[in-house]
Amino acid sequence: MTVTLRPPSSVRRSAWVKNPKLKPFLPYVVCLPIFLAIWQVISAILGQDRLPGPINVVANTWMPYIVEPFFDNGGTSKGLGLQILISLQRVAIGYLLAACTGILVGGVLGMSKFLGKGLDPVIQVLRTVPPLAWFPISLMVFQDANTSAIFVIFITAIWPIIINTAVGINQIPDDYNNVARVLKLSKKDYILNILIPSTVPYVFAGLRIAVGLAWLAIVAAEMLKADGGIGYFIWDAYNAGGDGSSSQIILAIFYVGLVGLSLDRLVAWVGRLVSPVSR
């Protein structure tokens, strides 16, 4: 009788693949090193001065941007952690205003076919305007860079919220409306028991799109005119043009993506908690 011995590496690899707790992480473990290796090779071809590789980015930004992300030397000389917090404060104000206004307006348009049809061309035109196109006129109106940046967030984020809220109301099944008529539900009971539960998934779909657009808008707006913020940090590093500027920009871009992903997941998580469909 012969016994086939498997190499230890093969055993470990098989255990990794079959382990239900580790298997979901396998694509990341495989793909991330490949991505970093390709990035390092491209960097070597183009030159570290043009595109720093991952090793150089970490080495050039380790102190203070990675180790001390919340340092504050006064003025706009702050760590990336503080710069992100400045941007998040602006996003929070603009996004919350857009959410409240968008849900209210979308609810009115969804319940009134006349207003919904009449204002649809206006909404479709305005929602296609790029965020930065609003910045000059907001500066002329508000005469303040911070308020203008918040307005850009608001005007960028509001449209998907309005549209999805209105669509959600229009998609309420006819059976639900027929039951409401048969039971002679009051307006209040109809809104609480039929309209809101049926519309919540659509509203959060709009909120999820809106938070991504809001984060994109603030980064771009801060590059044009702002005192602090992650967008300001990126543009300031570009204008500085020092040896570590490229590494600082790449690190900031990584943080921008990480925060954007976190905001998206946060809104999606809240939506799953609130939505009756997910229960």
Curated annotation (Swiss-Prot):
Keyword Ubl conjugation set for record: no
Keywords: Cell inner membrane, Cell membrane, Ion transport, Membrane, Nitrate assimilation, Transmembrane, Transmembrane helix, Transport
Assigned protein family: Belongs to the binding-protein-dependent transport system permease family. CysTW subfamily.
Function of the molecule: Part of the ABC transporter complex NrtABCD involved in nitrate uptake. The complex is probably also involved in nitrite transport. Probably responsible for the translocation of the substrate across the membrane.
Annotated GO biological process: monoatomic ion transport; nitrate assimilation
Subunit structure: The complex is composed of two ATP-binding proteins (NrtC and NrtD), two transmembrane proteins (NrtB) and a solute-binding protein (NrtA).
Entry membrane topology: Multi-pass membrane protein
Knockout-associated phenotype: Mutant is unable to grow on nitrate, but grows normally with nitrite or ammonium as the nitrogen source.
Organism encoding this protein: Synechococcus elongatus (strain ATCC 33912 / PCC 7942 / FACHB-805)
PROSITE patterns: ABC_TM1
PANTHER family xref list: ALKANE SULFONATE ABC TRANSPORTER-RELATED, MEMBRANE SUBUNIT (PTHR30151), NITRATE IMPORT PERMEASE PROTEIN NRTB (PTHR30151:SF7)
Chain ranges of the ABC transmembrane type-1 domain: 84-267
InterPro entries in alphabetical order: MetI-like (IPR000515), MetI-like_sf (IPR035906), NtrB (IPR005889)
Subcellular compartments: Cell inner membrane
GO CC annotations, alphabetized: plasma membrane
Pfam family for this entry, one: BPD_transp_1
Organism lineage: Bacteria, Bacillati, Cyanobacteriota, Cyanophyceae, Synechococcales
Protein name per the record: Nitrate import permease protein NrtB
MF term (GO), any: nitrate transmembrane transporter activity
TM helices/strands, residue ranges: 25-45, 91-111, 149-169, 200-220, 249-269
